[in-house]
Amino acid sequence: MTSSNAGAASRRAENPRARNRGVKPLLPRRPCGFTLIELLTVIAIIGILAAILIPTTSSARTAAKKAKTRGQFAQWGAAIESFRQEYGYYPTFEISGAGLNKVNGNTAGGTNLTAVHRFYETLVGTRRDGSALTGAATGNPVPPLGQNTKRIQFISFTEADMVPVSTTDSSLLTKRGLIRDSFDNTDIAVLVDRNLDGSIKFSAQGGDGINTLPLVSPPDSTTVRLAPNTTDFPTATQGGVRAGVVFYCMPPNGTSQTDLLMSWK
């Protein structure tokens, strides 16, 4: 061995770091899986996220249904306005009984789609089963046959607008064949500017045949029955509501007048 090689070997022997260069140190192996503390931390984070997201998702779903219901009100109102443009007056729906000034009037839910439904028949020109309107054309109120004398179809109600007769949903069995909003609510008020003065007014002096505003209930309660207050629906002396047609209903969980969904608000 040459002196230079011997010197290099001697230096490597004297320098253990150089001798071990290139050899990776062995790291202690980490146990597989999570520790109890890590699992509890993850569970806590999931709980916090769920508490944030679930109410947000529910609120978003409710807001979407409210928007859809407003869209329904707009379509129904447009059909009624088309009727007025065709005949020169607004149609008359129910004028007495529990269904006074209601979309479904006094029509009971069920499988008999030939039973008179004034709102549907007047705007569609047929019965709910598609058969032709028959019977008297005069009366009080005037039957649909005497109002839509040309049998013009002003609107086409879809399944989203009506509870199917074939439904097996126990909460909807008593509402079969009735018009509904996006919350499956069938208790919906409808008011029109009967005297064509540009606004809808209630009271005996209002001129629109609306003595009092109809009370409506949410689909999940029969004990809550409310109508708009005078802030939302001004009295006749205050000018009423500037509109030709208005609708309102109470969404689920509604308990006060501020919860009402009103087409003009």
Predicted region positions:
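Asp/Glu-centered strand-loop micro-motifs enriched in Gly/Pro and often flanked by an aromatic residue
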Residues: 3, 33-35, 167-168, 174
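Generic detector of low-complexity/intrinsically disordered segments
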Residues: 18, 28-29, 38, 42, ...
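N-terminal leader/signal peptides at the extreme start of proteins
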Residues: 1-34
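N-terminal pilin/flagellin-like segments and related low-complexity appendage regions
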Residues: 70-265
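N-terminal single-pass transmembrane signal-anchor helix
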Residues: 31-60, 65, 69
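Acidic/proline-rich low-complexity IDRs
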Residues: 24-26, 35-39, 52, 99, ...
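Terminal low-complexity, poorly structured segments
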Residues: 22-23, 32-36, 49, 109, ...
